[in-house]
Amino acid sequence: MGNLVIAVDGPAGAGKSTIAKIVAKKLNINYIDTGAMYRAVTYKCLKSGIDVNNEKEVIQIAENSDIDFKDNNIYLDKEVINEEIRTIEVSNNVSNVAKIKEVRQLMVEVQRKIGMKNSVILDGRDIGSYVFPDADYKFFLVATPEERGNRRYKELCNKGYNTTLEEVIEDIIRRDEIDSNREFAPLVKANDALEIDTTGKTIEEVVEEVVSKINL
């Protein structure tokens, strides 16, 4: 059997990363968090004092960044940045970086190279619709903004961030708007993707639903 490619798409907070990680372990295949790649570029921009709305400078940062995945870690220029890319500041700015066409093209190139070498499950916004339109399996996870906001809020509180549920939900809705309306490779459900509403479901229930659809 050749390499297996599984695409998991959906808006912020729908549970893509959590579900994809567990499915990857169950199927013993590699997991690629494509959103983390855009977060890495965003983090580097913020760390370098670059305005994320300055497309030219953001593209330069992306071109000069070495992003890699190994043993469930994401590396930026040879350093592990798992926690650094999960801050509120990065979350609030990542959609502005991810909407830049040239940045997406650079990241997609890396994603496709990884997918050609190994069996993978990738999660993101445009995996099934653009990065791997011929993926073997495509899933599109959704949930209400309130449910997604609640999940993100709990996650941030556990990390010690001082924010409100209202602010988190507002940010989720704002990111949906940017992701869905960007010109290049927007957040969209592929025609042949299976939509799963994760609202009110446990992680185990969603994982079981995904795994049950995959024939190895």
Swiss-Prot record:
The lineage of its organism: Bacteria, Bacillati, Bacillota, Clostridia, Peptostreptococcales. SUPFAM superfamilies: P-loop containing nucleoside triphosphate hydrolases. Pfam families: Cytidylate_kin. It is found in: Cytoplasm. It comes from the Bacteria. InterPro entries: Cytidylate_kin, Cytidylate_kinase_dom, P-loop_NTPase. PANTHER family: CYTIDYLATE KINASE (PTHR21299:SF2), CYTIDYLATE KINASE/PANTOATE-BETA-ALANINE LIGASE (PTHR21299). This is Cytidylate kinase. It catalyses: CMP + ATP = CDP + ADP; dCMP + ATP = dCDP + ADP. NCBIfam families: cmk. Coiled coil: none annotated. GO terms for biological process: nucleobase-containing small molecule interconversion; pyrimidine nucleotide metabolic process. Its EC number is 2.7.4.25. The keyword Magnesium does not apply. GO terms for molecular function: ATP binding; CMP kinase activity; dCMP kinase activity. It is an enzyme of class 2 (transferase).
